[in-house]
Every structure is written in structure tokens, then in C-alpha cells.
Amino acid sequence: MITETLTASSARPGEAAALIAEMGARARTAAKRLAQTPTAEKAAALKAAAGAIRARSAAILAANAEDMAAGQTNGLSGAMLDRLRLDEGRLAAIADAIEAVAALPDPVGREIDRFTRPNGLELSRVRVPLGVIGIIYESRPNVTADAAALGLMAGNAVILRGGSEAVHSNRALHAAFAAGLVEAGLPADAVQLVPTQDRAAVGAMLRAQGLIDIIIPRGGKGLVARVQDEARVPVLAHLDGINHLYIDGAANPAKAVELAVNAKMRRTGICGATETILIDRAYPAPLGIVDALIAAGCEVRGDRDVAALSPHVESASAGDWDTEYLDAIVSIAMVDGLDGALAHIDAHSSRHTDAIVTEDAATAERFLTGVDSAIVMHNASTQFADGGEFGLGAEIGIATGRLHARGPVALEGLTTYKWLVRGSGQLRP
């Protein structure tokens, strides 16, 4: 078969198209099977996949070490290397996340609503799988397992195309996952990994109408922009996380410091990390925020007012307000109250996650209703922007658009619905 012989160096456009067509056809067959697979069988397959990952942990970590060494040689940034790195704890978390997905309520077949028309027709909407999902992603090997688990539990077949940075990690994780599927009696074609790193394969996936039902890109602006520009199949985009934390004049200072440090520094390389902090001019202790971040190892870039607070603050450029650092860097600006914060967020937010720190309930409600982002928070760290923290299990990403899902995309976001109409012989007049 093409998938057994195609290599990264030989994948010319015609060969890549043939490869994706073959994989898509097999995925389509698997998707038909999965759409009818009972919940218990899907859950058993995921548990078997998690077990296989644990059993093969040494091989997976060795593969990841190979990727890490190559990444360091190739000059990957600290943030990219952090996303790429696996250790025993992270690998255990991947297996645990798969089992957590297996324990979630199955959305497939769930009735959304039901009603009867005056003519006696009984209508209902029920959730059904999307079909075949193509995932194109960079750096994060955990996406291999998360996407496979979520896609399968939602009754979908999945075609994975990971980045070259994580090629060995992705292959090792996929091999373990596929072994679990086969052990549980489900088709290995339910989760396939594109075997070539040639960019032509990405283009072929984007043009695979009739074979792939939706593409979900996970990566930087360049990848997402290419997918959105070239795709002929629907796209569910996960864009950058230019997230804001607004510290209101009525914020509790101790709480504000703790939230600012956690939201920025807990893990700087994730999409839920705060990148810009806005401080109300009425807030009494702005220097405390700046000093706490610097003490935590964060570089602070500030507007004129913030730069005047400390000699350790760098002056922010115009581009800083539109930058997703994914690093220990934060931009801080002083604003004129809630209206100033809302105006800044409206101009610079990527519509991912924005938060307010305040003890004023009315101000909090104005912020929650006034910010047009997928996730809006009050007195909570933006690092909670995560499907697992929302109780959704693993996530495929944070959708920042409006169709067809928004926020953490987990099981329900990987389904659609169909109408069921039950009659007794009604004729339309």
C-alpha cells in the first residue's frame, strides 16, 4: 500500500494526494463502523490504548528524547521544547487523560430536544459524529493521544498529521494507541497517522472533500493561516491566545498578585497563559504586581506609566500588545477603569480568554457580558482555560471562532446533529 512505501523525501504532490485519498477511504469505512459502536466498546478500546501507552512508556520516552535532541540542535525555542518534552509524569498524564475520556458521557445518540407539531409529526434532534476528522498540529505529542481519544469516543475516525519536530514521539504514541484499538476489536484505521512529513500531504488533506469532513489545525499563526487560506473542507480553527488579565481598582491586592503570577508564570508555553495585564489607574498597588512578576522570573514590558514604576521594566512597543509570547514575558498597561480595559481588549484580544480581578460584582458582570471572547473569567487564572479543567476531559483545542463550537472543544464539539421525524402517514397540503 502507498502508506507503507511513501517517505518524507518521496512525497511529491501526486503521491501525497494518492496517500491521503487511500487513508481517507479507509477512515471513511472505519467511521461508519464507529458511528454504530456502543459506548462500552469505545470505552474499552480507549482503556486498552491507555494501557498500551503505559506498557510502551520506555520506547515512547526514547522516541521523545530523539525529538528533543533534534529540536535542541535545530534551535527550537524554550517554549517549543517545553511543548515537545515528555517525561514519565507527562506520559502518565496522557494515559490518564485517555481513561478520563473513556469515562465521560457519550454524546452520540443523545437527544437534544423533542417536540410534536400540530399535525402530529414528532421531531427530535440527536447528536451524531462528524465523520472523519483531520488534525494538523505542531510540536505537542500529547495531541496525538488527545485527538485520537476524543475523536474515537465521539464516534469519529481521525487522520493525524503531526509536525516534524515530534515525528518520533508521534509515531510511538500512535503505534501504542493503534495496538490498543486492535486489542479491543476496533479497526486500526479508526486512528491513522500520516507517514510523511512532506508539506504536500497537508495540502492534500485540505483538498480532501468527500473524504475528510472537518480539519482542525493546532499550531502557530503560520499553520492556521495556511489551513484557513487553502482548505476546501470546513475548518475549526484554534488561534493564538493573546489573553488579558484586567486588575480592577476594586481588586483585592493579595489576590491580584497571586492571580497575575499564576496566570502568566504557571506554564508560560500554553495557550491559556496571560500575555497582557491591564491595571486600573485606581488600583492602589501596581508596583506590587510588577515586582511579583519580576521576582518570578518574568520579563515585564510596560507602557510609559508602568515603565516609570521600576527601572527593571522594559518599554513596550506597539507590537507587544498583539504578541502571544508563550514565554516568560508579559506586557502591562495602565488603563482608565473598566471602559479603558474593554477598549484595549476589544482592540487586541484574540478572543481566546480574558479575565477580570475585582471584588465589585457589578463591574465583574459588566466585564463578563462586555468581553467577546470564547472564555471570560472573574477572579480566576486564565490558565484554567482548558477542557480538562472544565470537566470536559481532554480537549482538541480552544476554538476562538463562532462556528460550530467555541471554547474548549471536547466530545460534544466533535459531534453534530440530525433531525429525526416520526409520523403516522402525514401528507403536506
UniProtKB/Swiss-Prot annotation:
GO terms for molecular function: glutamate-5-semialdehyde dehydrogenase activity; NADP binding. It catalyses: L-glutamate 5-semialdehyde + phosphate + NADP(+) = L-glutamyl 5-phosphate + NADPH + H(+). It is found in: Cytoplasm. It is an enzyme of class 1 (oxidoreductase). InterPro entries: Ald_DH/histidinol_DH (IPR016161), Ald_DH_C (IPR016163), Ald_DH_N (IPR016162), Aldehyde_DH_dom (IPR015590), G-glutamylP_reductase_CS (IPR020593), Glu-5-SA_DH (IPR012134), GPR_dom (IPR000965). Keywords: Amino-acid biosynthesis, Cytoplasm, NADP, Oxidoreductase, Proline biosynthesis. GO terms for biological process: L-proline biosynthetic process. Pathway: Amino-acid biosynthesis; L-proline biosynthesis; L-glutamate 5-semialdehyde from L-glutamate: step 2/2. Gene3D superfamilies: Aldehyde Dehydrogenase, Chain A, domain 1 (3.40.605.10), Aldehyde Dehydrogenase, Chain A, domain 2 (3.40.309.10). Catalyzes the NADPH-dependent reduction of L-glutamate 5-phosphate into L-glutamate 5-semialdehyde and phosphate. The product spontaneously undergoes cyclization to form 1-pyrroline-5-carboxylate. PANTHER family: DELTA-1-PYRROLINE-5-CARBOXYLATE SYNTHASE, GLUTAMATE SEMIALDEHYDE DEHYDROGENASE. This is Gamma-glutamyl phosphate reductase.
